[in-house]
From Swiss-Prot:
<dbReference type="Pfam" id="PF00926">
    <property type="entry name" value="DHBP_synthase"/>
</dbReference>
<feature type="binding site">
    <location>
        <position position="175"/>
    </location>
    <ligand>
        <name>D-ribulose 5-phosphate</name>
    </ligand>
</feature>
<dbReference type="InterPro" id="IPR000422">
    <property type="entry name" value="DHBP_synthase_RibB"/>
</dbReference>
<dbReference type="GO" id="GO:0005829">
    <property type="term" value="C:cytosol"/>
</dbReference>
<comment type="function">
    <text>Catalyzes the conversion of D-ribulose 5-phosphate to formate and 3,4-dihydroxy-2-butanone 4-phosphate.</text>
</comment>
<feature type="binding site">
    <location>
        <position position="39"/>
    </location>
    <ligand>
        <name>Mg(2+) 2</name>
    </ligand>
</feature>
<dbReference type="GO" id="GO:0009231">
    <property type="term" value="P:riboflavin biosynthetic process"/>
</dbReference>
<comment type="pathway">
    <text>Cofactor biosynthesis; riboflavin biosynthesis; 2-hydroxy-3-oxobutyl phosphate from D-ribulose 5-phosphate: step 1/1.</text>
</comment>
<dbReference type="GO" id="GO:0008686">
    <property type="term" value="F:3,4-dihydroxy-2-butanone-4-phosphate synthase activity"/>
</dbReference>
<keyword id="KW-0479">Metal-binding</keyword>
<protein>
    <recommendedName>
        <fullName>3,4-dihydroxy-2-butanone 4-phosphate synthase</fullName>
        <ecNumber>4.1.99.12</ecNumber>
    </recommendedName>
</protein>
<keyword id="KW-0456">Lyase</keyword>
<comment type="similarity">
    <text>Belongs to the DHBP synthase family.</text>
</comment>
<feature type="binding site">
    <location>
        <position position="43"/>
    </location>
    <ligand>
        <name>D-ribulose 5-phosphate</name>
    </ligand>
</feature>
<feature type="region of interest" description="Disordered">
    <location>
        <begin position="125"/>
        <end position="151"/>
    </location>
</feature>
<feature type="site" description="Essential for catalytic activity">
    <location>
        <position position="137"/>
    </location>
</feature>
<keyword id="KW-0464">Manganese</keyword>
């Protein structure tokens, strides 16, 4: 069964995006699937603005545990975050920067509370490069300008969703995994959404939404 059939219970593409925006404004998470011919995987996404220790613990416990902070190009530049590697030859050109840790307010940096502190420190509009230690336990991702219209990735989808919801343009994501450690695909993502009261949408939905409403995002 393809994504469209599986997600029909969540409404049409526009409704799915609108429900995701409502959830984010309420401080809840959403589940974002990328294209079936790409990774065909789902990420749990939370806004940095509303992020709680409990939500971070859920990502560590129920997902891959590799929690990434999606930042705009401008914020990553402001923090002077260089690429993780000089030559990025990953299949999807995921723009990891060096990993980070808050210099103040954390212990080992690995606990849910410490990761939330690091994330909120880095996403603060007034943050400075010297507020962060490198390396650390949080993995920033640099979103391409233009969002999903430029690159159909979870990073860009996260930043677009925050902007569309009127929230601070920073979000966290973590890939959802199955209990046996394999990657969750669309059927498992739908089940996860029901279990945790999270709407499900796709990158394709977001592209359709932006095209329909002619949304120009940074």
């Amino acid at each position: 069964m393809n994504q469209s059939s599986l997600l029909a219970e969540f409404g049409d593409p526009i409704t799915r995006v609108e429900n995701a925006l409502i959830a984010l404004k309420e401080g809840r998470g959403v589940l974002l699937l990328d294209d079936e011919d790409r990774e065909n995987e789902g990420d749990i996404i939370y806004s940095v603005e509303h992020l709680t220790n409990e939500q971070m613990a859920l990502m560590i416990r129920e997902c891959s545990g590799i929690v990434c902070l999606c930042l705009t190009d401008a914020q990553a530049d402001k923090l002077e975050l260089p690429p993780m590697v000089v030559n990025n030859n990953s299949a999807n050109q995921t723009a990891f920067t060096v990993s980070i840790e808050a210099k103040v307010g954390v212990t080992t940096g690995v606990s849910a509370a410490d990761r939330v502190t690091t994330i909120k420190t880095a996403a603060n509009p007034h943050a400075k490069p010297e507020d962060l230690a490198r390396p650390g336990h949080v993995f920033p991702l640099r979103a391409r300008p233009g969002g999903v219209m430029t690159r159909r990735g979870h990073t860009e989808g996260t930043i677009d969703l925050m902007q569309m919801a009127g929230l601070q343009p920073a979000g966290v994501l973590c890939e959802v995994t199955n209990p046996d450690g394999t990657m969750a695909k669309a059927p498992e993502i739908v089940a996860f959404g029901h279990l945790h009261n999270m709407p499900v949408l796709t990158i394709e939905d977001m592209v359709a939404y932006r095209n329909q409403f002619d949304l120009k995002l940074a």
